[in-house]
Curated annotation (Swiss-Prot):
Residues 1-29 form a transit peptide. Acetylated at Lys-166; deacetylated at Lys-166 by SIRT3. The modification N6-acetyllysine is found at K66, K166. Keywords: Acetylation, Apoptosis, Isomerase, Mitochondrion, Necrosis, Rotamase, S-nitrosylation, Transit peptide. The keyword Mitochondrion applies. Binds cyclosporin A (CsA). Is displaced by CsA from the mPTP leading to a lower open probability of the mPTP. PPIase that catalyzes the cis-trans isomerization of proline imidic peptide bonds in oligopeptides and may therefore assist protein folding. Involved in regulation of the mitochondrial permeability transition pore (mPTP). It is proposed that its association with the mPTP is masking a binding site for inhibiting inorganic phosphate (Pi) and promotes the open probability of the mPTP leading to apoptosis or necrosis; the requirement of the PPIase activity for this function is debated. In cooperation with mitochondrial p53/TP53 is involved in activating oxidative stress-induced necrosis. It comes from Rattus norvegicus (Rat). GO terms for biological process: apoptotic mitochondrial changes; apoptotic process; cellular response to arsenic-containing substance; cellular response to calcium ion; cellular response to hydrogen peroxide; mitochondrial depolarization; mitochondrial outer membrane permeabilization involved in programmed cell death; mitochondrion organization. One of its GO terms (cellular component) is cytoplasm. PANTHER family: PEPTIDYL-PROLYL CIS-TRANS ISOMERASE (PTHR11071), PEPTIDYL-PROLYL CIS-TRANS ISOMERASE F, MITOCHONDRIAL (PTHR11071:SF408). This is Peptidyl-prolyl cis-trans isomerase F, mitochondrial.
Length: 206
């Protein structure tokens, strides 16, 4: 499941905040991007994920990738969104969703949290831990321990500062946090989703 450390099967993310532990645990596409905030760079890529649940559209999530801080990690995610390497996120699922924590996706090989791969090979090292898990909408890499980044990622729905220094933050939601909340509503304490949540399309906006 997630890369929040739990051994070789990418089962991490089973532990919640210290103060409140969890019980369970392609081409590029042009469209309107989100408004850029003061902490955004006009040079950073904007990508999108179109998401559905049991075949019904939920909407679009637009993400800014912080290429100005973590260029290698941002490029991995960007290319997996466009599918330009011949593989990527389109058709994969949000396989693990824990309300009041995070929504995890990116395993496009096994679809259960045990697979996925990066554009650099199976895994690549932690780039840096400059960006922090400061609140809802943070985009971060899942892993199975240090230097095991692949394609799995998660979007936080709360501040998750206990993950700082363990997971590489590389972006944030620019538009569509309401869609993230819809995804979150189909989750459970175990992470199992009540509906099949699929990335029906994805790509790059700018």
């Amino acid at each position: 499941m997630l890369a929040l450390r739990c051994g070789p099967r990418l089962l991490g993310l089973l532990s919640g905040p210290r103060s409140a532990p969890l019980l369970l645990s392609t081409t590029r596409t042009c469209s309107d991007g989100g408004a850029r905030g003061a902490n955004s760079s006009s040079q950073n890529p904007l990508v999108y994920l179109d998401v559905g649940a049991d075949g019904q559209p939920l909407g679009r999530v637009v993400l800014e990738l912080k290429a100005d801080v973590v260029p290698k990690t941002a490029e991995n995610f960007r290319a997996l969104c466009t599918g330009e390497k011949g593989f990527g996120y389109k058709g994969s699922t949000f396989h693990r969703v824990i309300p009041a924590f995070m929504c995890q996706a990116g395993d496009f090989t096994n679809h259960n949290g045990t697979g996925g791969k990066s554009i650099y090979g199976s895994r690549f090292p932690d780039e840096n831990f400059t960006l922090k898990h400061v609140g809802p909408g943070v985009l971060s890499m899942a892993n199975a321990g240090p230097n095991t980044n692949g394609s799995q990622f998660f979007i936080c729905t709360i501040k998750t500062d206990w993950l700082d220094g363990k997971h590489v933050v590389f972006g944030h939601v620019k538009e569509g946090m309401d869609v993230v909340k819809k995804i979150e509503s189909f989750g459970s304490k175990s992470g199992k989703t009540s509906k099949k949540i699929v990335i029906t399309d994805c790509g790059q906006l700018s």
